């Protein structure tokens, strides 16, 4: 599912622009179905669904959640290949959403229906490693918009550029000499 909102120059019809975009997507095989909001209320309903995804994800409980980015041109490849990585590890569900215009993705892996995240403790690290290895291979980042924090410091050490890490440490030491 992709949610697209357009802003156009005065005098251009957003309905026509979206229909043209949709038709091109159908012809390329990128789109199989779609809706165009017919009112402000319907537009708000579409956005409400998108805005409630993080809350729904928390209620389900993920096997592994990722805030990653990849070059925009490689988003389709990432989604396809990451799905293959997950499928090799067992039956799981993927919820990928984000900001396609800048390559930032929330790539979340969930238990299959009828199971819980505790059923996947033995593969959580494999899921995380598989996703992070692919992000690294594609020249992306393990942290798109939510920062590294304490949970991702080991990942930063593993996948980070040594020169950038040294610069980060120097800045940290200069700003926080006590630690």
Residue spans of the language-model regions?
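Noncatalytic alpha-helical scaffold of FAD-dependent oxidoreductases
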Residues: 1-179
